[in-house]
Amino acid sequence: MTEAQTACPTTETPVAAPVAPRWRVADVIALYELPFNDLLFRAQQTHREHFDANAIQLSTLLSIKTGGCEEDCGYCSQSAHHDTGLKAEKLMEVDAVLAAARTAKENGATRFCMGAAWRNPKDRHIEPIKEMIRGVKDMGLETCVTLGMLEEHQAKALAEAGLDYYNHNLDTSPEFYGQIISTRTYQDRLDTLERVRDAGINVCCGGIIGMGESRRERAGLIAQLANMNPYPESVPINNLVAIEGTPLENAQALDPFEFVRTIAVARITMPKAMVRLSAGREQLDDSMQALCFLAGANSMFYGDVLLTTGNPRAEADRKLLARLGMSATEATQLSA
């Protein structure tokens, strides 16, 4: 044998080449800047490849612990840093949450989301929340919770309870984030999302537009979401509700066509995700909501209140879907 043949094999691991992002911010901006009809046509084509274009999932959101949050998110009425007149409340009893879930199901919802205004839950909170999750799932409803930042063992505990989705929004682009929040870093959010993913829970992650950000910064948010590996299974898009007493109470209202564009861009860049119309629907008239469905939104939050802000009344939503010939279903992906 030659010296080369008898030499010990190397133990060094080859360094992998950096993976290029699927979507550069410039690419997302290019989508935003397409003529409106072209953008919606492309989004609708993408939507039909993966979903029934006339199916909408109805989700109901319940605030299970309201107010007193330690974070200083500039848009939020529940922050203890802002004087919005909202009184802090304790975590709801399990039976009360399950009663609300039953009502939501009776009203046509197939997804029930539970939100708590915490920076992060204490371990003592996890057990009653697990009971809520199990009880809601026993009703045949899809479950989602949003509790703030999670530790690894907390994410695993929620997964053991059968949680379907954990919501933890990025809110905006990394570049604009510091103008909205100072008490939690962008990386804090990404770390929680990684723990959720590692625990085997589906990720629900989106953001809020209309906070004074530029189109480039909106594109930065979409690129950040779309470049996650994998991208979120659920992407809620919120239209800012300017709440008196918050730093963003005087924010200029977003052009509704820009909101529709954002829905379309989210659909194109994350084709298999549930794209959800979330807070701020009250600011969109029926025609604009119809355009959002055309752009690829296939879920909406349903009921009179989202956490602490108003929402179109359930009866109005049912009438709108009927006028459009759309049906309230689970809007599951088409089979391959």
UniProtKB/Swiss-Prot annotation:
Binding-site positions, [4Fe-4S] cluster: 69, 73, 76
Gene Ontology MF: a single term: biotin synthase activity
Keyword Transmembrane: no
Positions with a binding annotation for [2Fe-2S] cluster: 113, 144, 204, 276
SMART domains: BATS, Elp3
CC cofactor note: Binds 1 [4Fe-4S] cluster. The cluster is coordinated with 3 cysteines and an exchangeable S-adenosyl-L-methionine. Binds 1 [2Fe-2S] cluster. The cluster is coordinated with 3 cysteines and 1 arginine.
Pathway: Cofactor biosynthesis; biotin biosynthesis; biotin from 7,8-diaminononanoate: step 2/2
Top-level lineage group: Bacteria
Enzyme class: transferase
ATP-binding among keywords: no
InterPro entries (UniProt xref): Aldolase_TIM (IPR013785), BATS_dom (IPR010722), Biotin_synth/BioAB (IPR002684), Biotin_synthase (IPR024177), Elp3/MiaA/NifB-like_rSAM (IPR006638), rSAM (IPR007197)
EC number(s) given by UniProt: 2.8.1.6
Residues in Radical SAM core domain copies: 54-281
UniProt keyword terms in alphabetical order: 2Fe-2S, 4Fe-4S, Biotin biosynthesis, Iron, Iron-sulfur, Metal-binding, S-adenosyl-L-methionine, Transferase
A Pfam family recorded for this sequence: Radical_SAM
UniProt GO BP: biotin biosynthetic process
Entry cofactors: [4Fe-4S] cluster; [2Fe-2S] cluster
Protein family membership: Belongs to the radical SAM superfamily. Biotin synthase family.
Record-linked PANTHER family: BIOTIN SYNTHASE, BIOTIN SYNTHASE, MITOCHONDRIAL
Role of this protein: Catalyzes the conversion of dethiobiotin (DTB) to biotin by the insertion of a sulfur atom into dethiobiotin via a radical-based mechanism.
Stored NCBIfam families: bioB
Subunit structure: Homodimer.
Protein name as annotated: Biotin synthase
